[in-house]
Amino acid sequence: MEIKNLIDEDFCNYKKPAMFIGMPKCSFKCDKECGERVCQNSELATAPNIEIDNPGEIVIRYFQNPITEAVVFGGLEPFDSYEDLTQLLSLFACGSQSNYAQTKGMPDIVIYTGYEPEEIMEKLAPYGVLTSFGGDFIIKFGRFIPRRHHKFDELLGVELASDNQYAMRLEDLL
């Protein structure tokens, strides 16, 4: 498995302290649709990938950290690394039931995507089972559009880069 970055304690992408996992692939749909380079993660795209031999170690790191309450998957585009994203989500669900979880339980899961729900609904459907493990499962939808106003999202508790972007709970989509 490869990722772009791993931040054990991130306080910028969600209202709760979170582990941030940057996924390594993107089709750059935001750039293509507006006809200019607008990717907020363009520097990250050129950074080397980080090879993860044992993804379970990421899960253990999360559960051993007393500060974090959520896991955020972000840029590049998590759904362009669907198999790895699914593997990590499954590991977090299993980890929430293990001795590593101690009293933490299932973290809130947040996925930042540039896709719209109708573009990835077939990928979202299998994740429905994960909502039974506890914690919120939130997805931020919408491509970045330059020269649009920023918008505060109540569900995420953060300001989003353009006003067409929004977050929804997975259970409200399925």
Place the predicted regions along the sequence by residue.
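A cross-family glycoside hydrolase active-site/sugar-binding cleft signature
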Residues: G22, G74, V110-G114, G142
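Extreme N-terminal starter segment of soluble prokaryotic enzymes
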Residues: M1-I3, P107
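Structural recognition of alpha->loop->beta junctions
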Residues: E122-R148
